[in-house]
Amino acid sequence: MAAAAAATYFVFLNLSVEYEYLFADGGFSVDSILGKARRKKTFDCDKEDVRVIAPANSYVLKDYEKQGMKVIDCTSHNAGADVYALISQKGAQTTKVLFEPGDKMKAAMRRVFPRKFI
């Protein structure tokens, strides 16, 4: 009985997932914070790998989306959230990252990527 309770506690502890977005020197990374204790690198790309950054429902993304593209969802899944998509390409691997940037991050991305930020 105690083992089941302990297992349930650890499962529910890991269900609490928060995301931290870091945009510095043109590079973008996302860390997952599990149970408010453990940090795990979820995504990382360099400035040269970014193809486009646009709202997730933008028609511009249709030109970049490919079959077999890896999609990483780093959103809160809250209704009405301002979700953006970043498309990056490293070699043959194309990745789409869904995230919720704040106003300061959007302004910084617009400064660094004036032609890639929609």
Model-based region annotation:
Residues V71-I118:
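A membrane-cytosol interface segment of integral membrane proteins
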Residues M1-S16:
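Alpha-helical transmembrane spans
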Residues T42-K62:
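Structured surface patches comprising rigid loops and adjacent beta-strands/short helices at the edges
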Residues K40-E48, T95-P101:
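Short amphipathic beta-strand/extended segments with alternating polar/hydrophobic composition
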Residues A24-K41:
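Membrane-cytosol interface motif
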Residues K62-C74:
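Charged, amphipathic alpha-helical segments
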Residues G26, I33, E48-V50, P55, ...:
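Generic structural motif
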Residues L15-G26:
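A cytosolic-side transmembrane-helix exit/cap motif
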